[in-house]
């Protein structure tokens, strides 16, 4: 009879599962390295890599305390079980090792607590590497679950707790010890106080609950600006009588008996004679005028033929408060502006004469042959060009200057361009062709200065040169002729060193 083989404990089984997990990772990394080297160059010698692999396997077995015999037995557990059943031998009962807490963590008063399992106590000085390709540690620590802080106060610690061992599995996960209280079914009381509601609604007005009548309110006339118009809608509106100013003939009215004499003075222009003035009559406005209203000169002869101004007004009452005399010899004529066709004077005939005289004076003031067509387009006066000369200039020319600012060329105006010789050092000077002679450019001729022809005609030059120690200026210079532009470019090429 074969000797009885004791079954492995739970700790040995967990170590075996962990060893298998690490071996699967090691084999995957090993094959990855071998394939990489083989793909790079297939004539590599893999003896060093194989030796490192064997050292890793031996190190893993030493860490998890697994011998070769135990590993071989764990690979075929079912065959051993079948053989034992067929032989009729009794198998010893399986032993379960007690879970021992090795990290020394204090007890937590909460109902449920999860602790990470500790690694085996075996320590190794160093772990071989695949040439800094991968590192295999003793145990991959399980990630700790991040628990949020409880919002309510924890319940009182339970007196009786149950302990359960969880973890492991075929991939060798971390073990955990879970403690459960016997009072899990009871609901924990919360100590958080909910603040009282402080929302305050606005109070209703006094007449909020009072029902308003649908009948329209009677308008009150007291204190109103238009109080005198109150209750006018009840009275029928009457058409007002016309008693104003009119420019037509008066409608026909029953004729009255002609009056013998008119006591109201006539409306005349000029200074009347004392003998012709009638006695003053009472005015409509309550005041007795001492003199009649006069707008011009009047004569005694023009009593019947001259038409009266404002003769179309009513004879009963005048606009100015005087009653007109009865029409005896001449018919009433409407109000007219200008000279009268009957030869009599009009109220506005003097104004027409003044306007005609003003037109004649204006025509006489204009010279002969003058008119609006003779006025040409306004031409601004031209700025006088001053050609300033430089005593030490080797080349001078009158040019039009444009400066490149932003994204376009801006015209500066007409100026004088000089190439000056100062003790063997040449410089380009451009001044405005004015009395002040504003300096637009003063740059030393060096290798940074470039003069380039920019058109087919050859009279435009683009000059690029340093205007200061940190800035470059670009000028467009237009010469009078292409020959002048060529002389300038040749001179720049000669002296720009």
Swiss-Prot record:
<dbReference type="InterPro" id="IPR011993">
    <property type="entry name" value="PH-like_dom_sf"/>
</dbReference>
<keyword id="KW-0539">Nucleus</keyword>
<keyword id="KW-0811">Translocation</keyword>
<feature type="region of interest" description="Disordered">
    <location>
        <begin position="76"/>
        <end position="95"/>
    </location>
</feature>
<protein>
    <recommendedName>
        <fullName>Nuclear pore complex protein npp-16</fullName>
    </recommendedName>
</protein>
<dbReference type="GO" id="GO:0031965">
    <property type="term" value="C:nuclear membrane"/>
</dbReference>
<keyword id="KW-0472">Membrane</keyword>
<feature type="region of interest" description="Disordered">
    <location>
        <begin position="210"/>
        <end position="308"/>
    </location>
</feature>
<feature type="region of interest" description="RanBD1">
    <location>
        <begin position="390"/>
        <end position="497"/>
    </location>
</feature>
<feature type="compositionally biased region" description="Basic and acidic residues">
    <location>
        <begin position="250"/>
        <end position="260"/>
    </location>
</feature>
<dbReference type="GO" id="GO:0005643">
    <property type="term" value="C:nuclear pore"/>
</dbReference>
<dbReference type="GO" id="GO:1901990">
    <property type="term" value="P:regulation of mitotic cell cycle phase transition"/>
</dbReference>
<keyword id="KW-0653">Protein transport</keyword>
<comment type="function">
    <text>Component of the nuclear pore complex. Plays a direct role in nuclear protein import. Required for anoxia-induced prophase arrest; may function in concert with cdk-1 to arrest prophase blastomeres in response to anoxia.</text>
</comment>
<keyword id="KW-0813">Transport</keyword>
<feature type="compositionally biased region" description="Basic and acidic residues">
    <location>
        <begin position="231"/>
        <end position="240"/>
    </location>
</feature>
<keyword id="KW-0906">Nuclear pore complex</keyword>
<keyword id="KW-0509">mRNA transport</keyword>
<comment type="subunit">
    <text>Interacts with importin beta imb-1. Interacts with DNA-directed RNA polymerase III subunit rpc-1. Interacts with TATA-box-binding protein tbp-1. Interacts with GTF3C5 homolog tftc-5. Interacts with GTF3C3 homolog tftc-3.</text>
</comment>
<dbReference type="GO" id="GO:0006606">
    <property type="term" value="P:protein import into nucleus"/>
</dbReference>
<feature type="region of interest" description="Disordered">
    <location>
        <begin position="359"/>
        <end position="379"/>
    </location>
</feature>
<dbReference type="GO" id="GO:0051028">
    <property type="term" value="P:mRNA transport"/>
</dbReference>
């Amino acid at each position: 009879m074969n000797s009885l083989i004791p079954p492995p404990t739970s700790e040995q089984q967990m170590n075996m599962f962990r060893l298998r997990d690490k071996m699967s990772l090691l084999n995957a990394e090993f094959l990855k390295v071998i394939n990489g080297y083989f793909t790079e160059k297939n004539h590599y010698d893999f003896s060093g890599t194989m030796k490192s692999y064997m050292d890793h396997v031996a190190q893993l077995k030493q860490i998890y305390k697994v011998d070769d015999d135990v590993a071989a037995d764990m690979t075929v557990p079912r065959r051993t079980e079948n053989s034992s059943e067929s032989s009729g031998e009794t198998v010893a009962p399986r032993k379960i090792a007690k879970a021992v807490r090795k990290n020394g963590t204090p007890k937590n008063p909460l109902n449920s607590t999860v602790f990470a399992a500790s690694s085996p106590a075996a320590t190794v000085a160093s772990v071989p590497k695949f040439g800094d390709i991968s590192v295999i540690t003793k145990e991959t620590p399980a990630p700790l679950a991040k628990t949020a802080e409880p919002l309510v106060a924890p319940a009182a610690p339970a007196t009786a707790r149950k302990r359960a061992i969880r973890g492991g599995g075929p991939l060798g996960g971390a073990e955990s010890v879970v403690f459960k209280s016997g009072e899990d079914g009871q609901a924990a009381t919360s100590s958080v106080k909910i603040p009282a509601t402080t929302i305050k609604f606005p109070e209703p007005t006094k007449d909020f609950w009072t029902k308003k009548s649908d009948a329209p309110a009677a308008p009150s006339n007291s204190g109103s600006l238009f109080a005198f118009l109150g209750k006018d809608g009840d009275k029928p509106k009457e058409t007002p009588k016309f008693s104003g100013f009119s420019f037509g003939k008066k409608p026909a009215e029953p004729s009255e008996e002609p009056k013998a004499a008119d006591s109201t003075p006539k409306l005349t222009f000029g200074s009347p004679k004392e003998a012709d003035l009638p006695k003053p009559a009472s005015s409509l406005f309550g005041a007795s005028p001492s003199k009649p209203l006069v707008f011009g000169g009047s004569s005694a002869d023009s009593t019947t033929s001259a038409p009266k101004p404002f003769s179309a007004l009513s004879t009963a009452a005048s606009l100015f408060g005087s009653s007109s005399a009865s029409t005896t010899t001449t018919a009433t004529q409407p109000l007219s502006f200008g000279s009268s066709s009957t030869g009599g004077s009009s109220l506005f005939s003097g104004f027409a004469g003044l306007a005609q005289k003003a037109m004649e004076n204006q025509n006489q003031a204009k010279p002969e042959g003058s008119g609006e067509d003779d006025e040409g387009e306004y031409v601004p006066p031209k700025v006088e060009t001053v050609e300033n000369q430089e005593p030490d200039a080797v080349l001078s020319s009158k040019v039009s200057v444009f400066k490149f600012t932003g994204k376009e060329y801006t015209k500066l105006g007409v100026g004088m361009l000089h190439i000056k010789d100062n003790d063997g050092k040449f410089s380009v000077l451009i001044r405005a062709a004015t009395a002040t002679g504003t300096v637009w450019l003063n740059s030393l001729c060096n290798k940074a200065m470039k003069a380039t022809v920019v058109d087919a005609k050859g009279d435009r030059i683009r000059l690029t040169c340093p205007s200061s120690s940190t800035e470059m200026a670009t000028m467009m210079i237009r010469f009078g002729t292409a020959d002048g532009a060529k002389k300038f470019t040749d001179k720049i090429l000669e002296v720009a060193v």
